[in-house]
């Protein structure tokens, strides 16, 4: 949210609303973004995103997704789109959803090459593509303050608490998406 400079009145869309994406929904809302749009393939994840503050939740495989975004933004599309997945189709969709001068922020990590659309589309609409990795110490301190004041809710991002003796099982559950975990 800091990298994209989300502020009051921005329209924000988040692709991939698992752990990081769910927090992006909350932080964008706290920064004053309106509307905040969650996009994912999993209906349960989309429901959680709505509980966490997303104004709209759409499936990424919906063939009418861009039309729906266009309709709710009165044709403007989004000012900021976050890719919390890190694969080519997701980044392309983020870029496609951008308004003139819009920013796409890539957060998800994968070994795939970046493919974000045509130069024509980027240049005519003055779109921006930003990368992001990690946080600074002061960002962590701000998040801790937000937690202590009750502004940020991380309870839905903790799927299960396990003893250290079960760590192998916890990692296996995460890797195999058993129970749709976010954090164990």
Positions of PLM-derived features:
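C-terminal hydrophobic helical "lid"/dimerization subdomain
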Residues: 92-96, 137-184
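Mid-domain Rossmann-like dinucleotide-binding core that forms the NAD(H)/NADP(H) cofactor-binding site
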Residues: 1-63, 67
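A generic alpha-to-beta junction signature in SAM-dependent methyltransferases
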Residues: 4-6, 73, 85, 98-99
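N-terminal Rossmann-like NAD(P) cofactor-binding module of classical short-chain dehydrogenase/reductase
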Residues: 79-82
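Short loop/turn segments at beta->alpha junctions
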Residues: 61, 65, 86, 136, ...
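Conserved amphipathic alpha-helix within the SDR
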Residues: 65-75
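Structural detector of well-ordered beta-strand residues that form the stable sheet scaffold
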Residues: 13, 37, 103-105, 130, ...
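Glycine-rich phosphate-binding loop and adjacent beta-alpha segment
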Residues: 55, 87-151
